[in-house]
A protein has these predicted regions:
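Short, surface-exposed "cap/lid" segments of acyl-processing enzymes
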Residues: 65-95
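Primarily recognizes the serine-hydrolase "nucleophile elbow" in alpha/beta-hydrolase
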Residues: 124-189, 198-199
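The feature captures the conserved acid-bearing segment of alpha/beta-hydrolase catalytic domains
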Residues: 169-184, 195-232
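Short beta-to-alpha linker loops that shape the active-site pocket of alpha/beta-hydrolase fold enzymes
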Residues: 78, 101, 106-110, 176, ...
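N-terminal cap/lid segment of alpha/beta-hydrolase-fold proteins
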Residues: 17-66
Length: 281
């Protein structure tokens, strides 16, 4: 169902996850920060590698053994205006336990930059990441992995020329894909999208690359309008002929969804881990 039907029926509660989840959002985000500090020492490799002059143009690299099959490039969420790669360290630790190599990206945020500038900076970041991987002999296939706004970012960056013939999959967790809806929300005070830019970055009118497999996941306890974003995106991919799976995670909301999907010991996480590993075969 189109997001437009919600214009007179609670856009904020449908399309602002912090409003939808209520007090649990702050609890979850505080837990992410606390657990990420506690588990940072589980992550080997290098932190805060620069790909540009802005202080948020940084990424972490956590290599797996070179015979391991997949490298994940992660993009954090936060509605393009908040959070940090460091908030994802405990999720990265869970993925590392699964045997994946990891690149955890930061990027300049709105309103310090526009969405278009953000995507340009991240394109530079992908250039630098691929150069670093190749220089280190890390030639494994790549999966891009993103939550919320990070899912939107991953779909658009699928067109990056340095990822051609190497990007095998995208795991998009509880994403927002029709960016025009942001024009109706309070978060646009920070994101500052205009009509033309919102259209430019709509994932349905500017579809992601043909070739990678897609895993589109969303929490079963999320608002119906938000769930529809993932369903509509998965349906568009399937209609185009892409390999796309839709996974509704029963009982999970926008934030604990990430905890469960990164953890191979959770049944939803085991399914995602298996899907990612299958792409190396």
């Amino acid at each position: 169902m189109s997001w437009r039907v919600w214009r007179d029926h609670g856009m904020e509660s449908q399309f602002n996850p912090r409003v939808a989840v209520g007090n649990a959002a702050a609890v979850c985000l505080a837990a992410w920060a606390e657990q990420s500090v506690a588990r940072k020492n589980e992550l080997t490799g290098r932190f805060d590698l620069a790909y540009g002059p802005h202080h948020l143009m940084r990424y972490d690299f956590h290599p797996a053994q070179k015979d391991r099959p997949i490298i994940i490039i992660n993009f954090h969420g936060g509605y393009w205006r908040a959070l940090d790669k460091a908030d994802m360290n405990h999720h990265m630790a869970d993925l590392a336990k699964g045997g994946f190599g990891l690149v955890n990206m930061n990027y300049p945020l709105c309103p310090d930059v526009s969405m278009t500038q953000m995507m340009t900076h991240l394109g530079t970041g992908i250039d630098d990441v691929v150069k670093m991987l190749d220089a280190g002999g890390h030639h494994q296939p790549i999966i891009m992995f993103g939550h919320s706004a990070g899912a939107h970012i991953a779909l658009h960056l699928s067109h990056h020329p340095k990822l051609a013939n190497r990007l095998v999959g995208i795991a998009a967790l509880s994403g927002i894909y029709e960016t025009e809806l942001v024009l109706e929300l309070a978060v646009n005070e920070d994101v500052r999208l205009g009509k033309d830019e919102a259209y430019k970055w709509n994932c349905l009118t500017h579809m992601p690359a043909v070739g990678p497999a897609y895993y589109i996941a969303v929490g079963g306890s999320e608002p119906s309008g938000w769930i529809d974003q993932s369903w509509i995106m998965a349906e568009a991919l399937c209609q185009r002929g892409d390999s796309a799976q839709f996974h509704g995670c029963g009982g999970l909301h926008h934030f604990n969804l990430v905890d469960c999907l990164c953890d191979a010991n959770h049944h939803d996480g085991a399914r995602l881990h298996d899907w990612m590993k299958s792409l190396s075969r």
